[in-house]
Amino acid sequence: MPKSVDSLFLARTMNRFNPIVLVGLLLSPVLFLALAGRTDGNRPHVLFIAIDDLRPELGCYGSPIAKSPNLDKLAGEGMRFDRAYCQQSICSPSRASLMTGARPDQIGVIENTAYFRELNPDVVTLPQHFIKHGYEAVYCGKIYHARMTDDHHSWSRKPAYDRCPKMKWLPGNYALKENQELWASNKEKMLAKYGKAGSGGLIHGPAYEAADVEDHVYGDGFSTRLAIATLEDHLERKPSQPLFLALGFKKPHLDFVAPKKYWDLYDRDEIELASQTKSPKGGAATGLHASFELRTRHGIPKSGPIGPDLAKTLLHGYYACVSYVDAQIGMMLEALDKAGIREDTVIVVWGDHGWHLGEMGIWGKATNYEIATRVPLIVWTPGMKARGQSTHALVELIDLYPTLCELADLPRPNHLAGKSFVPLLDEPKSKWKKHALSQFPNPALREWAANPLSPGMRQTFFGPLIKEVEGKIIRQQGKSWDRDLFENHLMGYSLRTEGHRLVAWMDYRDLDAQPVFLELYDQKADPDETTNVASGNPGKTDALLRQLKRELARAPPRPAK
């Protein structure tokens, strides 16, 4: 806010109060933080909120069930992006792509186990770029994938742990003793049976929990407390320095764990199961997984369908987690208002990818379809003209890096693959991108972290399920079946246009070769992507394939080592 506004505010205060009262006001913490929030150079603060595994399942996106009043209000005061897409529908690649401003192929991060900094030691990340231009940058919660937090480069300080009560460690991240014991027992069994290497990803307890505890007992509530304390600490210590504050929520990622009061917001009888539970007719057998991530949880069938009662409980848990996170965001926004810096802050809320909640017969992320690649994106800026509106423009998460640079009046790094969507904040109906590009390596024959099947995975309880999925692919491919290609080198590239989605399954070592399989979905006639119409529309399929290859040529995969 301009200094003249502060001067006017003080002048009015002088006229209304005597000097003794005025001194008391100036010494009050709220007013101190309000005045402290003015930054040098009028550069805005940035509140950068990431939500794990959240698809656009919010009231503001038309969900008839989800209770998300705080995000709904933010969208009503900012801008809602109705067609925003991630670059890969799994945690580490999606987040690394957004934070570096490059596509997964460009940085070589196509699985959770790949660390972008090891592969790209000189890349300048989004918060790193802000630090270079005078910002303080700090994160609370999950921004990058676990153990790949890039602390040395991306962040200039640690959160204010000294101002926040410590969080009690929860075994397995469960609050209920019986669930902690189930987790510990499962851990012991998996380690004994498969060893440390073979049990990776298999050690879990129940898929859900509804403990009657305070919000901060679980991680997301603690992260919110910590972020608020860090905000206050920064405004006291460095009042004139702009702050890039990243707050990352781990829910509604499995396990669906949230305080009981958020479960109580929902009437179980009103929760509807997915209506489209079949795989796409004529679709790629390699395009869907067998819900591996969910099936590692205690009490979930290791094969076969998820029954309706269990499915409803899982949906209930997902919605409870959505409301839990929404409440935390409400507290964070209230802290901005209390500090008096809301009008000096750019707010961005994004989900890293979508999630199948029974759609197409599976549970989880990790596909190239609409339900997994489309994400929620809400932006609020102090000076936006199209307040309270939405846009149908196609945008991608890699567009956030250049957008925030423009909003903060920072130079744009040369390596960015995205496009600033600042013009949409003024005119949401502007002509925009013709497509959004996502990718995912063979979901059917990869582990749930997108990494190739480990040597021992076929020997676990997933062995029969892997064999079943593999059999479907072999039957579809016939003589073209190549185990090494399908397990290690097959990439699905998904091009989303105004009216269609093309999914081209290709050997990413040779993008000039003929695709192994092609899928085409008519988004206007078939928004649920129930039927692959590629064979009946060769002209449209070929045109979109050429368009896809042109885009891939601009950002080719890193050479395989």
What do these predicted regions represent?
Residues L520-Y521:
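Short hydrophobic beta-strand that contains or immediately precedes a catalytic carboxylate
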Residues D526:
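Intrinsically disordered, low-complexity polar regions and short flexible loop motifs
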Residues V21-F32:
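Bacterial N-terminal signal peptides
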Residues P2-K3, R12-P19:
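Positively charged n-region of N-terminal signal peptides that target proteins for export
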Residues L35-R501, R509-A513, T531-R550:
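Formylglycine-dependent sulfatase
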